[in-house]
Amino acid sequence: MAYITKRGNSFGVRYTYEDEHGKSCDKWESFPTKEEAVKRQKQIEHELATGTFLIPSTVTVAEFLMDWLPKQCSKHKWAPKTYESNLSTIQNLIIPYIGDMEMQKLRPYHMENLYTTLSKTPCGSYIEGKKQELGEKQKRRTLSGTTIHEVHRLLGTAFQYAVEWGIIIKSPVPVDSPKKSTQERTIWTVDEMRAALDSMEDPVLHLAVHLTLVGALREGEIVGLTPDDIDFDAADGIGTFHINKSMQRVRKEALNQVDDGCIIKIFPDKLERSTTSLILKSTKTASSCRTIFMTSALKEELKKWLGQMAADETKDPERYRDSGMLFRLPNGLAIEPVLIRKKFLKWQDAHPEFPRIVFHGLRHSSATYQLMISGGDVKVVQGTTGHATADMLVNTYAHIQQSSRVELGKKFEEGFYVKPGTPSPQAVPAEGEPTISVSALVELLKNADPEVKAQLRLALLT
């Protein structure tokens, strides 16, 4: 029951409820008029009778999220990087702005204000929850729409749990999410890929890039390879390498929170008091486990690389530290993803004639090229790239390159301007040009024997 008591010039509503621990609690709420007090009295009695009463709580957004995060990690068996990414979002993009607000006082307009603030916030304003001093150039680079969309997604999920846990009645997260950034990534053409590979003299970088272009690998998958993943005799001597592991450097805090079932190996720390660990883990999804067919050039390079590894071990066996990885330093220690990225950046600085791309752009370029040479066979290319769904592959990686658009324009001109009853003009090939068009060749290959398709693909990638 709820009772109304006049207290001076106001009216108080007194009621008793049980908290989340079953303890009986008394609560007073004050109102300026009796009408408001009566309205609140009826609301409380109805909610207590129907079990919809919201227990008063002063839990803040920061307190709730830091309680929710490890529970979600344990429930869904997150990988270390997933936990680390979500923790970073909470610490750097949410808590500094709405962390001190009480959950029960949060409203949709607070969320809209958060998104507006983030859209004007420079990248890196907070690191591990600590305010950073940024230079003028850094201040001009603000958070992307994709990043703000991720904040919206995380809060949407978290606040639904707050509703289930009885902390709030309704989620304050707006239905409409902030728009993602749609800027297309820069990729290389096949000529640029080939020329870039030819210009790379660093054997570590050359092999890493070669593997990426053939198999559309992720950075962690490249350095996550081990010698026993390679089979030179598989597929009737074509040779294959198997992708089932990934290497990452993660914060030790994340390792303490996640299920270690996905972790294959934790490498020894190189520095004392390191706050991060280098780990080898199973790939993030079942579809990421895949077998890649070698090209003859890649096969020879891998054989040469393994031969050099054996030679390095015999030079100084006492100091050699066999990490068990395919990519390793001359002393046997594992090469981690950041070193590959640094080598690639150094190469790019020395070769400004190539379009500037991030290392992951090589995977992007490879997937796009393979879609082109396969005649758009998404399922076949998906088997190589390891995307969880075909839609993800098409939406993320399928670029229409300039050469394809030019060809499309020519076909439009040939067909659109022909008058009824007039035979279509046939292009006469110049001397030395093939007498079959690319489109006709693609149609023939679609119905070709699978073995012929595989041989042609290997020839094009060699």
What label would you give each PLM region?
Residues 1-32, 240, 244-274:
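Short, Arg/Lys-rich segments that mark the N-terminal edge of DNA/RNA- and chromatin-recognition modules
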Residues 3, 17, 70-164, 182, ...:
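N-terminal core-binding DNA-recognition domain of tyrosine site-specific recombinases/integrases
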Residues 7-113, 128, 307-322, 402, ...:
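N-terminal DNA-binding module of tyrosine recombinases/phage integrases
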Residues 124-127, 198, 202-203, 215, ...:
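Short, basic (Lys/Arg/His-rich) helix/loop patches that form interaction surfaces
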Residues 127-145, 149-151, 164-227, 235-238, ...:
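Basic, Lys/Arg- and aromatic-enriched nucleic-acid-binding interface segment
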Residues 179-180, 187, 245-249, 385-411, ...:
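Catalytic-site neighborhood detector that most strongly recognizes the C-terminal catalytic loop/helix
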Residues 229-237, 375-398, 424:
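Short, polar N-cap/turn motifs at the start of nucleic acid-interacting alpha helices
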Residues 232-235, 245-289, 298, 410-462:
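C-terminal secondary-structure termini that scaffold catalytic or DNA-interacting sites
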